[in-house]
């Protein structure tokens, strides 16, 4: 009986890459796998045909011979009649599908495994984040069971080798002309069985516990930064190493300061008279109060920089600055006399160039409305 073209069997072109070839074989093999088509008597033949095609085309030398001479160039090496045999199909299937079915170089037997990492969110004030601190935290976790030493077996006893898999954690299942490795259903891949479990951990080898830990927070941390505590995660299974604990920083809002990188920002209200005549006032910083000089004729929104009064980055470098934005406060609750004095001041300023921005704005409005055609 004549054989179909191998490229046609896998539905690929003759210039297909090795990666695309493997992908095509996976698709065809999954489609015609006997376990998925128990009601189709032809599926096994189609599966064998696809495996034979892939066995040839995935080998550079065999593929070159096939491209030059066709089936005649590989008949001595491919298929069930040559050196490949059923064992080769098993190897091919395990290589391509090992991560799905546990065959070939895929999963291995169970054994000690690393514990899971944990995450803890630490709320910090801005002061503690900038200056650094040490805090105590309580973390629920899994720790190794002390009575059994993490084995899960009753003290004085030991886990027994699984009789189903012989301690390998895997069993080989014969599927027609090939075999597939699967996780042992008896020991679930552990390779051993606990016949007399520990009463403390009920055979799990680990117990729940809330640990109290001391966390040293370095100066300069910010929201999103993580502090790693090695080995403070969950205990590993079967004596495996513990995972790590990652403490994630969340800096709370401050009543006065806002942080942007290494700089701090704040708003400072000043009186109308200090803005006009100039003055000096105290402003708070994270290191205490400092004096800020306000020059005469200061406009609202102006930024004043206090160098070095910001944040020192956690990874080193120069400290940032404190940026003070002044906000001019309009007087309220004026007395009759105060209002009269302000009226006199207002009258005395008519015709003077005391409000250049306002005058520029009014001039712009005149030009704007003058250009409008009503």
Swiss-Prot record:
<feature type="binding site">
    <location>
        <position position="165"/>
    </location>
    <ligand>
        <name>Zn(2+) 2</name>
    </ligand>
</feature>
<feature type="binding site">
    <location>
        <position position="201"/>
    </location>
    <ligand>
        <name>Zn(2+) 1</name>
    </ligand>
</feature>
<dbReference type="InterPro" id="IPR008971">
    <property type="entry name" value="HSP40/DnaJ_pept-bd"/>
</dbReference>
<feature type="repeat" description="CXXCXGXG motif">
    <location>
        <begin position="145"/>
        <end position="152"/>
    </location>
</feature>
<comment type="subunit">
    <text>Homodimer.</text>
</comment>
<feature type="binding site">
    <location>
        <position position="184"/>
    </location>
    <ligand>
        <name>Zn(2+) 2</name>
    </ligand>
</feature>
<feature type="repeat" description="CXXCXGXG motif">
    <location>
        <begin position="184"/>
        <end position="191"/>
    </location>
</feature>
<feature type="repeat" description="CXXCXGXG motif">
    <location>
        <begin position="198"/>
        <end position="205"/>
    </location>
</feature>
<dbReference type="InterPro" id="IPR001623">
    <property type="entry name" value="DnaJ_domain"/>
</dbReference>
<dbReference type="GO" id="GO:0008270">
    <property type="term" value="F:zinc ion binding"/>
</dbReference>
<dbReference type="InterPro" id="IPR018253">
    <property type="entry name" value="DnaJ_domain_CS"/>
</dbReference>
<dbReference type="Pfam" id="PF01556">
    <property type="entry name" value="DnaJ_C"/>
</dbReference>
<feature type="binding site">
    <location>
        <position position="162"/>
    </location>
    <ligand>
        <name>Zn(2+) 2</name>
    </ligand>
</feature>
<protein>
    <recommendedName>
        <fullName>Chaperone protein DnaJ</fullName>
    </recommendedName>
</protein>
<dbReference type="InterPro" id="IPR036869">
    <property type="entry name" value="J_dom_sf"/>
</dbReference>
<feature type="repeat" description="CXXCXGXG motif">
    <location>
        <begin position="162"/>
        <end position="169"/>
    </location>
</feature>
<keyword id="KW-0677">Repeat</keyword>
<keyword id="KW-0862">Zinc</keyword>
<feature type="binding site">
    <location>
        <position position="145"/>
    </location>
    <ligand>
        <name>Zn(2+) 1</name>
    </ligand>
</feature>
<dbReference type="GO" id="GO:0042026">
    <property type="term" value="P:protein refolding"/>
</dbReference>
<dbReference type="GO" id="GO:0051082">
    <property type="term" value="F:unfolded protein binding"/>
</dbReference>
<dbReference type="InterPro" id="IPR002939">
    <property type="entry name" value="DnaJ_C"/>
</dbReference>
<dbReference type="GO" id="GO:0051085">
    <property type="term" value="P:chaperone cofactor-dependent protein refolding"/>
</dbReference>
<feature type="binding site">
    <location>
        <position position="187"/>
    </location>
    <ligand>
        <name>Zn(2+) 2</name>
    </ligand>
</feature>
<comment type="similarity">
    <text>Belongs to the DnaJ family.</text>
</comment>
<dbReference type="InterPro" id="IPR036410">
    <property type="entry name" value="HSP_DnaJ_Cys-rich_dom_sf"/>
</dbReference>
<keyword id="KW-0479">Metal-binding</keyword>
<keyword id="KW-0346">Stress response</keyword>
<dbReference type="GO" id="GO:0009408">
    <property type="term" value="P:response to heat"/>
</dbReference>
<feature type="domain" description="J">
    <location>
        <begin position="5"/>
        <end position="70"/>
    </location>
</feature>
<keyword id="KW-0143">Chaperone</keyword>
<keyword id="KW-0963">Cytoplasm</keyword>
<dbReference type="Pfam" id="PF00226">
    <property type="entry name" value="DnaJ"/>
</dbReference>
<dbReference type="GO" id="GO:0005524">
    <property type="term" value="F:ATP binding"/>
</dbReference>
<dbReference type="GO" id="GO:0031072">
    <property type="term" value="F:heat shock protein binding"/>
</dbReference>
<dbReference type="InterPro" id="IPR001305">
    <property type="entry name" value="HSP_DnaJ_Cys-rich_dom"/>
</dbReference>
<feature type="binding site">
    <location>
        <position position="148"/>
    </location>
    <ligand>
        <name>Zn(2+) 1</name>
    </ligand>
</feature>
<keyword id="KW-0863">Zinc-finger</keyword>
<feature type="zinc finger region" description="CR-type">
    <location>
        <begin position="132"/>
        <end position="210"/>
    </location>
</feature>
<comment type="function">
    <text>Participates actively in the response to hyperosmotic and heat shock by preventing the aggregation of stress-denatured proteins and by disaggregating proteins, also in an autonomous, DnaK-independent fashion. Unfolded proteins bind initially to DnaJ; upon interaction with the DnaJ-bound protein, DnaK hydrolyzes its bound ATP, resulting in the formation of a stable complex. GrpE releases ADP from DnaK; ATP binding to DnaK triggers the release of the substrate protein, thus completing the reaction cycle.</text>
</comment>
<dbReference type="InterPro" id="IPR012724">
    <property type="entry name" value="DnaJ"/>
</dbReference>
<feature type="binding site">
    <location>
        <position position="198"/>
    </location>
    <ligand>
        <name>Zn(2+) 1</name>
    </ligand>
</feature>
């Amino acid at each position: 009986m004549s054989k179909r073209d191998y490229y046609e069997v896998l539905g690929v072109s003759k210039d297909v890459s090795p990666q695309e070839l493997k992908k095509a074989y996976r698709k065809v093999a999954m489609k015609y796998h006997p376990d998925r088509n128990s009601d189709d008597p032809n599926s096994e033949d189609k599966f064998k045909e696809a495996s034979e095609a892939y066995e040839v085309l995935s080998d550079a030398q065999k593929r070159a011979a096939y491209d030059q001479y066709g089936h005649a160039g590989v008949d001595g090496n491919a298929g069930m009649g040559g050196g490949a045999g059923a064992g080769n199909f098993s190897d091919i299937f395990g290589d391509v599908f090992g991560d799905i079915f546990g065959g070939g170089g895929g999963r291995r037997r169970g054994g000690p495994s690393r514990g899971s990492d944990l995450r803890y969110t630490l709320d910090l004030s801005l002061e503690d984040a900038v200056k650094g601190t040490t805090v105590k935290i309580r973390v629920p976790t899994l720790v190794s069971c002390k009575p059994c030493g993490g084995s899960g077996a009753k003290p004085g006893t030991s886990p027994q080798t699984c009789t189903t898999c012989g301690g390998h954690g895997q069993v080989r299942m014969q599927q027609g002309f090939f075999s597939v490795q699967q996780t042992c259903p008896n020991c679930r891949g552990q390779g051993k069985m606990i016949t007399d479990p520990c009463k403390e951990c009920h055979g799990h080898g680990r117990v729940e516990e809330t640990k109290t830990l001391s966390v040293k927070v370095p100066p300069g941390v910010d929201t999103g930064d993580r502090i790693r505590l090695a080995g403070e995660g969950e205990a590993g299974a079967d004596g495996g190493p513990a995972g790590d604990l990652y403490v994630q920083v969340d800096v709370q809002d401050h009543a006065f300061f806002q942080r942007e990188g290494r700089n701090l920002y704040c708003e400072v209200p000043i009186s109308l008279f200090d803005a006009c005549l100039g003055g000096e006032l105290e402003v708070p910083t994270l290191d205490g109060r400092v004096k800020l000089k306000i020059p005469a004729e200061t406009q609202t929104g102006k930024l004043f920089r206090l160098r070095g009064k910001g944040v020192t980055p956690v990874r080193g470098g120069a400290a940032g600055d404190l940026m003070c934005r002044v906000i001019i406060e309009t007087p309220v609750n004026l007395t009759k006399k105060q209002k009269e004095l302000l009226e006199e001041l207002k009258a005395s300023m008519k015709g003077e160039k005391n409000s250049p921005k306002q005058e520029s704005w009014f001039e712009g409005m005149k030009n704007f409305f003058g250009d409008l055609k009503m």
